[in-house]
Curated annotation (Swiss-Prot):
Expressed by the venom duct. Acts as a neurotoxin by inhibiting an ion channel. The cysteine framework is C-C-C-C-C-C-C-C-C-C-C-C-C-C-C-C. Contains 8 disulfide bonds. Keywords: Disulfide bond, Ion channel impairing toxin, Neurotoxin, Secreted, Toxin. It is found in: Secreted. Coiled coil: none annotated. GO terms for cellular component: extracellular region. This is Turripeptide OL55.
């Protein structure tokens, strides 16, 4: 569902990237990371429904800190893997995961 603010969304969802999505640690189950707010991944555990609990968002007061040196905080405030790094999570904005590495 499209949105411009969280009040446009059904209860329990959050407006992220103009879409109503499941917030971090939200009650709703997810199928893929695209069901979760930007920077949060969907995790499956022992065949249970997916949960939005893998947090790749930048940390700190200014939301500009990434603890993994292979990642950097991009303009979406997501800790994305840098060019040439193995994509164990999202690549930084502008890169895609190809052949297990983040590339332009």
């Amino acid at each position: 569902q499209a949105c411009s603010e969280t009040s446009d969304c059904l209860e329990g969802l959050e407006c992220s990237g103009n879409q109503c999505l499941i917030p971090y640690d939200g009650d709703d189950s997810c199928v893929t990371g695209f069901d979760c707010v930007i920077g949060v991944g969907c995790v499956y555990d022992n065949g249970n429904p997916g949960r939005c609990i893998r947090d790749h968002r930048c940390k700190g007061d200014k939301k500009d800190i990434c603890t993994n040196p292979a990642t950097e905080c991009d303009e979406d405030k997501v800790c994305g893997y840098k060019e040439g790094e193995t994509c164990y999570g999202p690549c930084r904005k502008g890169l895609t995961c190809r052949n297990t590495r983040c590339q332009k």
